[in-house]
């Protein structure tokens, strides 16, 4: 074995050791999650008719929270609310709204505050229904900002939290999801900056940015089935991870496990990073790729 090979092996061992130490330190330093703290918590979940948002609603219901859920389809939300009530939610209500309409975003927050008497958690999870809506940015980005601004006063009073559902595609560039990724990068930038501002102002409000990989929602599975070589992780597990991270007021959380390491080492080996990303896709020039989403 050459001296160069020995040096490379030593470097890789040190790199792996550093990654393990960083991961253990992150997990060790996280506060203990207590389920009982969420009993009676006042929670607004957006994008809650299907996928991760639906699973978030069910988990919060099992924990005895008071829920307002929102999405576009009222008939689907009605069924989700009914199940939340069966699972043990103290209260469960829905507001049918289209986040492409600025007045709807304000209305949802106002109605949730009026119905619940305030908010402890604002969980921002919705996405636009089409690539055109994503390019526009009204749904995937601007409505998040608008709802956060509207909810901040009541969250300040309750020492509450904003939970933002983001994506690994908002940390690392990837193909065939450009509108979606662009808005996730924007969310990470805005809410990451807002975290600093709130900390400097000694605010009572915490922000948790949840970085997700590929999740097995119906929406995501339908759009990626022909051209992605990746394992999708369960929506119900990702939802539980999100709730735990928000309840313990972590500034950032990662699910599944590989998203943490991908983010940690994204700039260390750019050539291999790019090859790994491209290898994850089955590209056929004759295909018309559909935007990848995870929510």
Task: Mark where each language-model region is.
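Active-site helix of classical SDR
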Residues: 148, 183
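Rossmann-fold cofactor-recognition segment
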Residues: 85-103
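Conserved glycine-rich Rossmann-like NAD(P)H-binding loop of the short-chain dehydrogenase/reductase
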Residues: 63-80
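Conserved glycine-rich cofactor-binding loop
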Residues: 42, 47-50
